[in-house]
Amino acid sequence: MTWAERWATIERFLPQLWDGTLVTLQLVGLAVLIGLFFAIPLGLARASRHWYIRALPYSYIFFFRGTPLLLQLFLVYYGISQFEVVRKSFLWPYLREPYWCALITMTMHTSAYIAEILRGAIQAVPPGEVEAARALGMSRRQALQYIILPRAIRIGLPAYGNEVILMLKASAVVYTITMMDIMGVIRTINSRTYQYELFFFVA
């Protein structure tokens, strides 16, 4: 098979590749946005001075940062369905679908990492700025809202950007639960054509 024939095959499957790309981008985009929403209270709790406030978020973050995303994906997709109470619940129409299982898993996974990014950013806020806020008569809540969080967001933004890129790369594992994301589409096409160029083309 010549290179022209190989590229012709790729062009033939471009619509499917585009659809898979959209699924991947949608999945990653929703995961990092929803994950950020959940990460804010987790990060604030992790930055607390009280151990009993830090304990539960620490356990959550420890689990999701300490185990592979693929294992978490299998636990949600294959593990939860083993419980009859789940299969009879109103959540079952969603939990039996690979898309929602992938979205839930990726959201929980990335929220743990973003929470640690936020915790580090909060602790990196110069103490002088916090002291200045208190000297102006701001309460702890006001200082958090107007001084600490805005400053922490600016500090943590580069690391958050890196997390988005890492999640985009990690999303390749969702094809293992029959998701037709970009990797799932490529695997399907590859099983028909045996062309390895598709992997390089998408990369």
Name each model-derived stretch.
Residues 1-203:
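Transmembrane alpha-helices and adjacent helix-loop boundaries
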